[in-house]
Amino acid sequence: MSSKTAYTELFVSRYQPVEKGKRWAWVLIRTVLVVGFCFIILFPLFQRLSIAFRSKADIYDPTVLWIPRNFTFDNLRIAIETTNYFEALGNTALISASTTLIQLVSCALAAYAFARLQFRGSGLLFGLVIVTIIVPPQTIMIPLYLTYRYFDLFGLVGLFSSKDSLNLIDTFWPFILSSSTAMGLKNGLYIYIFRQFFRGIPKEIGEAALVDGAGVFRTFLRIMVPNAVPAIVTVLLFSFVWQWNDSYYVSLFLKQVKVLSTSLMDMGVGLREPDPVYTSMLLNTGVLLAIAPLILMYLFVQRYFVESVERTGIVG
């Protein structure tokens, strides 16, 4: 055996344990991180699930940790009655579903224009889209409210009616109009997601469609939309969840209409419970009822959501 061969075998014999140790260390680190993140996310959910079925006596029983001793549905009943749960659930689902579908169309069209159509000022306009992501919506709260409180589309309302303007507050129209113009909740982010995905589609595909006689809209519908399914799923889920949990716009535009987010904010006043600990338990039950539909939805679409996030490159 030559000295070179002996040296190689010695190096390999020493190198393999080191690599194996690094591999096991990386597995341990990943396991700790995954378990830690799961604990952070799932602990509040399991805690609220346990609280929802406890009786008032279980609150002050130090032996009750997770499993209720006096199992009851009273907390759920009180939370449902106080929040007008089913009415609020229907309104929330209607607003979330309608605005999500409208935003999907308007943001995709706007993003397609930024990604494929060359026109003067496109860079400036896209920069303004990015600004809408950065600037908090609270800074334009008063203009937004006044726009829909005294709505007048270029003076056309006065031409066709005796009123100078329309009051769209306490209706769904502010959500529909803002979503139709790609100015709704988080629409700047959705335009950015679609634009980046459309830019990743080879230009040759669109050019071939134009050569075959397809126009801009036909190319968008026949070429871009079928290839943008991952981006569509991502925007669909993000838009629905954000709209479901929104409390800013609904409290600004809907004063009398019941939705889940505002019902939860008013729940503490409606309970009139002198015991603050029991009030907190009922509020936690209300939160659980509000997020339950989202959890059920995620259980059915989680595979599509993970695939879409991986393909669009959305992280964080």
Model-derived features with residue positions:
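A structural signal for multi-pass alpha-helical bundles of membrane permease subunits
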Residues: 4-12, 18-22, 26-316
